[in-house]
Amino acid sequence: MSNALYLMLDIKKRLTNIKTCDTLSSTNQYMEVSIMKKVKIGSIIVKILEVFHWVGTVLMAAATVCSMAAPQWVGYFVGFDAKECCGANLTVYGFEVTAPVTNGNADMTTFFLFGIGATVILGLMAMVFRNLSLIFKRSENNTPFQKDNVRMMKEIGIFSIAVPVVGFVMSVIARIVIGAEAAEISINQSGIFMGIIVLCLTQFFAYGTELEKDVDGLL
């Protein structure tokens, strides 16, 4: 009788352990699926932003060229809703230039300088979102601690810092060429801070990559 009781208790304990393991396994699978869905959604959003920025880069480059080839058409389009007293306010990611407006047409020299800076800035931001998209894609079915991901994160930090620097340089050039009223010399500190933070995170990713390499070597 005693042996039968012990046997029943042992069977019950084993069944409980199996049930617990199944529950933990189901929980882990649910968490993995949830993480994968979030990574997939993030990848789609970043890809859309990348495409928008590449389109913006191409359009801005075309408008910059047209400002010299067909200045009257571009000048009317830019100064369509602007007042002569205030000028046309042109801005992108902290880089801001005010183009004088005369008879409804914006000054094309100002727009040309703005277009050069805006094209470079939009191209840099497109590269930021491109790298983010690749990082998401590489991490869908693999660990994020990869050598290529570390390199791309470092590039993101550099591009983020380069955006306000380009805006600052073009603002200085605009003031020299056009005048002090055309552009305000300032630098977008948020872009620099974001770039520095990303570069710091890159060091953690590099350390994680080395640790994962050591673990794989032990296995």
Residue ranges of predicted features:
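Interfacial loop at the N-terminal end of multi-pass membrane proteins
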Residues: 40-43, 59-113
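Alpha-helical transmembrane segments of integral membrane proteins, especially early/N-terminal helices
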Residues: 71-92, 118-123, 155-158, 214-218
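Transmembrane alpha-helical segments in integral membrane proteins
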Residues: 108-137, 203
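Transmembrane helix-loop junctions and nearby membrane-interface residues
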Residues: 58-75, 126-129, 169-179
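Membrane-helix boundary/interface segments in integral membrane proteins
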Residues: 131-152
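Alpha-helical transmembrane segments of multi-pass integral membrane proteins
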Residues: 151-219
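Short, positively charged and aromatic/hydrophobic N-terminal segments
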Residues: 6-10, 17-30
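Lipid-exposed faces of alpha-helical membrane segments in multi-pass integral membrane proteins
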Residues: 52-62, 116, 120-123, 159-169
